[in-house]
């Protein structure tokens, strides 16, 4: 049953991309046109609104985490893929996405058995983990054309960040040149799946096989 659900979600995402392609529509272009020609109740054309924005959140130890916000059209296209990737994460025994307490207990049990424990983290993964690597991994799940479109949808657009300079608010535009924007649906799930595969690959480099 779970496998059937995963396949259904995968097909839904591919159907969304095929529908857009049939009408020669790229979601980010469509969004730009919609906000450009929007009007208020008096018929006056509204000022175009940025459809990709960045927001910064200060965390402990001086760390600043950058979140990206995209438009509803992009999120709607990505939702089936988002659910599909999370269904894969849910099937991985050592993934803690859906039950962190169970994962901690599992780590304790394995550490007591082996007499040691190791932890891994990706530094600046959002910005620096190559989206090309993620496309390569995603290609094995949904095909290379769809995987490349996924990346295009996320990084082939401007993201705007407003900040105060003196007494004036200024806005700068940025593009992701290496990683991908954390905040869009499917983004975090793809990062987590890539992390799993990187750890397994590292293990295969030092010993034969994978681990659980």
Where would I find each of the regions flagged by the language model?
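Viral RNA-dependent RNA polymerase
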Residues: 1-212
């Amino acid at each position: 049953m779970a496998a059937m659900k995963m396949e259904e979600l995968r097909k839904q995402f591919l159907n969304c991309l095929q529908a857009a392609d049939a009408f020669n529509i790229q979601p980010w272009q469509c969004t730009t046109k919609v906000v450009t020609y929007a009007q208020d109740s008096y018929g006056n054309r509204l000022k175009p609104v940025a459809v990709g924005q960045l927001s910064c959140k200060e965390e402990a130890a001086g760390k600043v985490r950058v979140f990206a916000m995209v438009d509803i059209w992009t999120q709607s296209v990505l939702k089936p893929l988002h659910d599909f990737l999370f269904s894969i994460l849910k099937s991985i025994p050592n993934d803690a996405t859906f039950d962190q307490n169970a994962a901690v207990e599992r780590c304790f049990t394995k550490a007591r058995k082996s007499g040691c424990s190791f932890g891994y983290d990706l530094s600046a993964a959002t910005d620096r983990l190559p989206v090309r690597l993620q496309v390569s991994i995603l290609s094995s799940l949904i095909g290379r054309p769809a995987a490349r479109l996924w990346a295009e949808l996320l990084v082939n657009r401007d993201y705007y960040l407003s900040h105060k300079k003196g007494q004036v608010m200024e806005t700068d535009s940025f593009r992701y040149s290496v990683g991908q924007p954390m905040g869009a649906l499917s983004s975090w799930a793809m990062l987590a799946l890539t992390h799993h595969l990187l750890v397994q690959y590292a293990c295969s480099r030092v010993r034969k096989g994978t681990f659980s």
